[in-house]
């Protein structure tokens, strides 16, 4: 994806620091204080232009959401949604999510969303995929005991790789669809990419997974 440079983006982000948290590491262990309640916290890694996380926050006021996106020129579009209509249960982070433990403590997060992540198709780039084992370990470090990962993509190869990676890590699948839009799954909120790809006839794949809490018998 080629990103369009937006020279105003950084100034906009600095101006609205109540929405885009510039120092997330300082809130490590204290995100509930920042939100002002003890509601569950869900994060989206690679939030892009923010439609998904914004609509989720709007639909679920009793859940706090944090959208994490490293590209300034992209996250500013998510910020514009909050400027137009503020949601008290949504914050944004303009940082790389390579190590979430810098931002969150163990058990601070209830769910991780991964939507249409970069597939990094070349084998030598496998470690960059957000479902590679080091990332799975990273999510495990910040999730509650029964926390979940919800993963969605139109890329069959990435989906198959992710299922294998999660299984090898010892995760348990609680939901799996090989054609989400033609399933009986309810409550799906589409991302910008999802709408684009599905309109072209692409299948949408989805899996929900938990970390195994007991040893295999």
From Swiss-Prot:
Keywords on record: Methyltransferase, S-adenosyl-L-methionine, Transferase, tRNA processing
Keyword Methyltransferase included in the entry's annotation: yes
Pathway assignment: tRNA modification; N(7)-methylguanine-tRNA biosynthesis
Keyword Methyltransferase: yes
Residues that, per the record, bind S-adenosyl-L-methionine: 44, 69, 96, 118
TM spans (from-to): none
Chain sites annotated for binding substrate: 122, 154, 191-194
GO molecular function annotation: tRNA (guanine(46)-N7)-methyltransferase activity
Enzyme nomenclature, EC number: 2.1.1.33
Pfam (any one): Methyltransf_4
Bridged cysteine pairs (disulfide): none
Coiled-coil annotated spans: none
Active site: 118
Reactions catalysed, as given in the entry: guanosine(46) in tRNA + S-adenosyl-L-methionine = N(7)-methylguanosine(46) in tRNA + S-adenosyl-L-homocysteine
Domain of life: Bacteria
Gene Ontology CC entries for this record: tRNA methyltransferase complex
Cited function: Catalyzes the formation of N(7)-methylguanine at position 46 (m7G46) in tRNA.
Similarity field: Belongs to the class I-like SAM-binding methyltransferase superfamily. TrmB family.
Record-given protein name: tRNA (guanine-N(7)-)-methyltransferase
Gene from which the chain derives: trmB
């Amino acid at each position: 994806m080629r990103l369009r440079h937006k020279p105003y983006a950084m100034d906009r982000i600095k101006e609205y620091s109540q929405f885009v948290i510039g120092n997330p590491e300082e809130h490590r262990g204290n995100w509930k204080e920042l939100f002002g309640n003890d509601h569950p916290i869900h994060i989206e890694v690679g939030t892009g232009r923010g439609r998904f996380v914004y609509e989720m926050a709007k639909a679920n006021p009793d859940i706090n959401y944090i959208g994490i996106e490293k590209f300034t020129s992209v996250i500013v579009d998510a910020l514009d949604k909050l400027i137009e209509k503020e949601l008290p249960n949504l914050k944004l982070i303009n940082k790389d999510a390579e190590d979430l433990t810098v931002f969150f403590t163990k058990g601070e997060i209830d769910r991780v969303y991964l939507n249409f992540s970069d597939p990094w198709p070349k084998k030598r780039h496998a470690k960059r995929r957000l479902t590679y084992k080091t990332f799975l370990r990273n999510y495990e470090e910040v999730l509650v005991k029964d926390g979940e990962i919800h993963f969605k993509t139109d890329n069959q190869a990435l989906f198959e790789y992710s299922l294998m990676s999660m299984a090898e890590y010892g995760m348990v699948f609680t939901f799996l669809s090989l054609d989400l839009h033609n399933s009986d799954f309810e409550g799906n909120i589409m991302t910008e990419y999802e709408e684009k790809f599905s309109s072209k006839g692409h299948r949408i794949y989805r899996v929900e997974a938990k970390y195994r809490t007991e040893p295999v018998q």
